[in-house]
Amino acid sequence: MMFEIKPLCKSDYDFAVELANTMDWHMAAEDFIFMDSLEPEGCFLLRDDTNPVGIATCISYGKIGWFGNLVIRKESRKKGAGSALVSHAINYLRQKGVETIGLYAYPYLVPFYTKLGFRSNINFSVLHNPNLSPISTKPLPTIKKSDLLSIVRFDQAFFGGNRKKLLQSIILDPNNTSCCISQDDQILGYVAATVYEKAAWIGPLICQSQRPDIAVALVNSVLSKLATKHVYTVIPQDSALAELFFSAGFSEDFFVTRMFLGQTSTKNCIYLTESLERG
């Protein structure tokens, strides 16, 4: 089988969206436009001869990289296409100076990624509330543009990579919401949420592990602004925030396993993912 891999172009977006949504990912062209704005040439199209059969995405954060979407047409699976795309993305990230690559794997794909050198870390629950009830809580300070550098440094200390390009794209978008808590000019935790007309995704959140009270206050502040929406978030299965989300009406849709190729990058903290695609 003759594979060709090239960067995903705008003319490929219709195929990419159609293929991605065979996985019930509810993606749109805007998702690939957003990925391209963050990581030009980080989205890939795989062709078998002249036929497009697969896509993959990845993003670099300095020494940390993240592998995101991987989809192969059903009739082209188990023929090496998936391995070819993952290997191509790994090489791309290595050339960008990435030392550690993370991803979130569905349980059935853990053996596949293990064969490619990834090692399982911990499991994360994908939570969903289809109609969030109103929550009353004390509002917290919104993250301002002048706070961004401090937020990026705080985030990097725990995540391990510099997510400035991602964080500023979320935090500075007026449609989204965010807040942080500081003490003596030191950030203790922050959260951001991407908000759509009828849905929202809470994350990223990073908070010092010894301050679950701060993390709870951050989440409640964001939840208070999302009433009646479909709300999603992804948490470690042993998260200090699990009880809060379950009591707010969230339930687990499915779980994934975080895996790393290279040294595990994250430090102990209270954590919500930004997305399954970007870490």
Task: Enumerate the predicted regions with their spans.
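Conserved acetyl-CoA-binding loop-helix of GNAT-fold acetyltransferases
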Residues: 72, 78-91, 115, 211-224, ...
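Conserved GNAT acetyl-CoA-binding A-motif
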Residues: 93-105, 226-237
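Conserved beta-strand in the GNAT
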Residues: 45, 51-59, 66-71, 186-195, ...
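Short amphipathic alpha-helix that is part of the acyltransferase structural core
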Residues: 1-31, 124, 133-162, 199, ...
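A short helix-loop-beta-strand connector motif used in the catalytic cores of GNAT acetyltransferases and
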Residues: 28, 34-54, 66, 123, ...
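Amide-forming acyltransferase catalytic core, primarily the GNAT-like/NAT-type
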Residues: 94, 118-200
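Active-site/acyl-donor-binding loops of N-acyltransferases
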Residues: 116-135, 232-279
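Flexible loop/N-cap segments at domain edges
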Residues: 188-194, 198-234
